[in-house]
Amino acid sequence: MKTKDYVQELNGLTTEQLLNREKELKEQLFNLRFQLATGQLENTASLKTVRKNIARVKTVLRQQELNN
């Protein structure tokens, strides 16, 4: 998914949905780090992608917080 599409999707979500998305991404990042440590991870770029997506979710949450 392209970045602009992903951010637009995030902007349409409620605060609760964003918090759930952040939790899911953090779990995914944990699993990826575990795979990296055990040598099972083939696509190391996925770590960067998930980290950036977590930052995007946090940014949208902060924007919503400031707008309310």
From Swiss-Prot:
Lineage top rank: taxon: Bacteria
Alphabetized Pfam families for the sequence: Ribosomal_L29
GO cellular component: cytosolic large ribosomal subunit
The keyword Aminoacyl-tRNA synthetase belongs to this UniProt entry's keyword annotation: no
Signal peptide: none
CDD domains: Ribosomal_L29_HIP
Record-linked InterPro entries: Ribosomal_protein_uL29, Ribosomal_uL29, Ribosomal_uL29_CS, Ribosomal_uL29_sf
GO molecular function: structural constituent of ribosome
Keywords for this protein: Ribonucleoprotein, Ribosomal protein
Alphabetical GO biological process terms: translation
Family: Belongs to the universal ribosomal protein uL29 family.
Protein name (Swiss-Prot/TrEMBL): Large ribosomal subunit protein uL29
Species, as recorded: Limosilactobacillus fermentum (strain NBRC 3956 / LMG 18251)
Lineage of the species this protein comes from: Bacteria, Bacillati, Bacillota, Bacilli, Lactobacillales
